[in-house]
UniProtKB/Swiss-Prot annotation:
Key words, A-Z: Acetylation, Activator, Cytoplasm, Isopeptide bond, Methylation, Nucleus, Phosphoprotein, Transcription, Transcription regulation, Ubl conjugation
Residue(s) carrying Phosphoserine: 70, 86, 90, 136, 171, 274, 306, 368, 393, 433, 456, 489, 492, 613, 624
Modified residues (Asymmetric dimethylarginine): R51, R99, R120, R123, R161, R168
One annotated GO biological process: gluconeogenesis
Subcellular localization, as worded in the UniProt entry: Cytoplasm; Nucleus
Lineage of origin: Eukaryota, Metazoa, Chordata, Craniata, Vertebrata
Protein name per UniProt: CREB-regulated transcription coactivator 2
Species the sequence originates in: Bos taurus
UniProt xrefs under Pfam families: TORC_C (PF12886), TORC_M (PF12885), TORC_N (PF12884)
Positions of post-translational Phosphotyrosine modification: Y488
Length: 693
């Protein structure tokens, strides 16, 4: 017990002592806390004082430099230093304004709620356009609005605005953001254009503000006005902004705006110009429904309208189509191209193109010698053969025989008389496109053999003659009619008789005509169509060229469709009638014999070149650029010019045509004259030279 008692008291003492210790500890703790608090307060005070001073300094600095941060300063500088300077110069002492500003600023900043209604209003305005307080636009508007209230209010407003501007301006990013989003700012400031604000401000200031302040305001107004006229647009857009962020004057913002606007316009213009141009040039020209490979190229040609373009197109198409004939319209080649529907279409010229797209069948038709045959029919029994000259006759044929009246016109078959070999080649080229059209209705092409006469009526004499090649008349026919010449490649042309190919674009295939020689006898594609038959020299020295082009030469799968009952027969069809036949067949049926050799060659070449596919027309595998010249020569001087030669001619024509493309219509017409001389090998050579040039 004692122990316990002793312990008890001891414990009590311990406990008692403990409280003391606790109290001491507590006291110490409190003391420390107080010290810390004091230190903290000191620090806070220092910070606060520093902050205030910094703000004051900043305000003074900013004010001196211009209201608002660097950006606002810049803007103001652009808009007018007087506005900013006036406050500086104004009676308000920078120190006084600074102090006042500092106080107000402090109040406003710390308890923004306490901010005077003016400031709040300004802020609201600012925020309206830009919800963020950063928007510099609000400060400007608020400042201006404050100005009218009186010198003190104005000063106060300025001070307020400065702080807000400073705060907002302090972050360039904020300014940039606000500036970059001028639409809101502009929308807000725009309503109160600088000029408007100044006016109102000026009036209010004059009455309300101190004389000094009003003076300042006036200066500001003047500056603003000056600025406005000076930078009407800039002030409007930038001023609006500047008002908000004192950046109104900032030309930088306006510049970005303007540049943006300008860029937009120029891009639009560029886009409209460049793209539209390209589109017009490239896309529009192509047929609405161009055959993918050929037509795309073809349309270009078509657009080019010049034979040269056609030639290029043909080349591409022909190549793509593999209708090597295509362009040349070597009869075989032509057919071959015909076989390629696309090629055919490409073959057809721009006009042809049009017709091709719809008349394609026609083209084929005419091309198909069935229709051509008709023409040839008209001319001779050669119906097919004549038809064979679809290209040549095609023009006429087209119009006459086929609905492709357009093509006919295009072809200007009448114009194509072989007689004008010189002109014919170039013209032929031009008409060539039309020729494509001549293909005439698909039926024609279908009936190719059957229809020989069908086109004939349409074909009409010219066409018939052309087609016939019988046409020797062709000689009589103008060069244009001579168009057949490009079929000139007759051999290939004849080959083209194959209907199937013709259908698509037989026309180019005047070849069809050659092929068509015998509308009735469609030979197997494989069938060799040899224009073994030598045609009598006929008018053309070409005389008997044996258009030996075996169908195989044409190697047109389509040749099978050739209506040539037998190559010979086709050719033979009307040897007499075809006297020109060689020309007609080999060259363009229509082309008169004399013309045929050269004219045909040339025409053929031209035609081929035009179609560009001529060479492509593998029709005459033989056709080769090198051979082309020879072909021209051969056509001009070699009676025995064979289809293969014609094929070569096609190749040549293609090559030459391509070169010739630059010549254009004028060049073609020039060539036309030489075409007349074409019969003379020398002339032919010169003609070729021209083309090369």
């Amino acid at each position: 017990m004692a122990t316990s008692g002793a312990n008890g008291p001891g414990s009590a003492t311990a406990s008692a002592s403990n409280p003391r210790k606790f109290s001491e500890k507590i006291a110490l703790q409190k003391q420390r806390q107080a010290e810390e608090t004091a230190a903290f307060e000191e620090v806070m005070m220092d910070i606060g004082s520093t902050r205030l001073q910094a703000q004051k300094l900043r305000l003074a600095y900013t004010r001196s430099s211009h209201y608002g941060g660097s950006l606002p300063n810049v803007n103001q500088i652009g808009c007018g230093l007087a506005e900013f300077q006036s406050p500086l110069h104004s009676p308000l002492d920078s120190s006084r304004s600074t102090r006042h500003h500092g106080l107000v600023e402090r109040v406003q900043r710390d308890p923004r709620r306490m901010v005077s209604p003016l400031r709040r209003y300004a802020r609201h305005i600012d925020s309206s356009p830009y919800s963020p307080a950063y928007l510099s636009p609000p400060p400007e508007s608020s400042w201006r609005r404050t100005m009218p209230w009186g010198s003190f209010p104005a000063e106060k407003g300025q001070l307020f605005r400065l702080p807000s501007a400073l705060n907002r301006t302090s972050s360039d990013s904020a300014l940039h953001t606000s500036v970059m989003n001028p639409s809101p700012q502009d929308t807000y400031p725009s309503p109160a254009a600088p000029s408007v604000l100044p006016s109102r401000r000026g009036g209010c200031l004059d009455g309300e503000t101190d004389s000094k302040v009003p003076a300042i305001e006036e200066n500001l107004l003047d500056d603003k006005h000056l600025l406005k006229p000076w930078d009407a647009k800039k002030l409007s857009s930038s001023s609006s902004r500047p008002r908000s962020c004192e950046v109104p004057g900032i030309n930088i913002f306006p510049s970005p705006d303007q540049p943006a606007t300008v860029p937009v316009l120029p891009p639009a213009m560029n886009t409209g110009g460049s793209l539209p141009d390209l589109t017009n040039l490239h896309f529009p020209p192509p047929l609405p429904t161009p055959l993918d490979p050929e037509e795309t190229a073809y349309p270009s040609l078509s657009g080019g309208s010049s034979t040269s373009n056609l030639t290029h197109t043909m080349t591409h198409l022909g190549i793509s189509g593999g209708l090597a004939l295509g362009p040349g319209y070597d009869a075989p080649g032509l057919h071959s191209p015909l076989s390629h529907p696309s090629f055919q279409s490409s073959l057809s010229n721009p006009n042809l193109q049009a017709s091709l797209s719809s008349p394609q069948p026609q083209l084929q038709g005419s091309h198909s010698h069935p229709s051509l045959p008709a023409s040839s029919l008209a001319r001779h029994a050669l119906p097919t053969t004549s038809l064979g000259h679809p290209s040549l006759s095609a023009p006429a044929l087209s119009s006459s025989s086929s609905s492709s009246s357009a093509s006919s016109p295009v072809l200007g078959a009448p114009a194509y008389p072989a007689s004008a070999p010189g002109a014919s080649p170039r013209h032929r080229r031009v008409p060539l496109s039309p020729l494509s059209l001549p293909a005439g209705p698909a039926d024609a092409r279908r009936s190719q053999q059957q229809l020989p006469k069908q086109f004939s009526p349409t074909m009409s004499p010219t066409l018939s003659s052309i087609t016939q090649g019988v046409a020797l008349d062709t000689s009589k026919l103008p060069t244009d009619q001579r168009l057949p010449p490009y079929p000139y490649s007759p051999p290939s042309l004849v080959l083209p008789t194959q209907q199937p190919t013709p259908k698509p674009l037989q026309q180019p295939g005047l070849p069809s005509q050659a092929c068509s020689v015998q509308p009735s006898g469609g030979q197997p594609p494989g069938r060799q169509l040899q224009y073994g038959t030598l045609y009598p020299p006929g008018p053309s020295g070409h005389g008997q060229q044996s258009y030996h082009r075996s169908m195989s030469d044409f190697s047109l799968g389509n040749l099978e469709q050739f209506n040539m009952e037998n190559p010979s027969t086709s050719l033979a069809l009307d040897p007499p009638g075809f006297s020109e036949g060689p020309g007609f067949l080999g060259g363009e049926g229509p082309v008169s014999g004399p013309q045929d050799p050269h004219a045909l060659n040339h025409q053929n070449v031209t035609h081929c070149s035009r179609h560009g596919s001529g060479p492509n027309v593998i029709l005459t595998g033989d056709a080769s650029p090198g051979f082309s010249k020879e072909i021209a020569a051969a056509l001009a001087g070699v009676p025995g010019f064979e289809v293969s030669a014609a094929g070569l001619g096609l190749g040549l024509g293609l090559e030459e045509e391509l070169r010739m493309e630059p010549l254009g219509l004028e060049g073609l017409s020039m060539l036309s004259d030489p075409c007349a001389l074409l019969p003379d090998p020398a002339v032919e050579d010169s003609f070729r030279s021209d083309r090369l040039q």
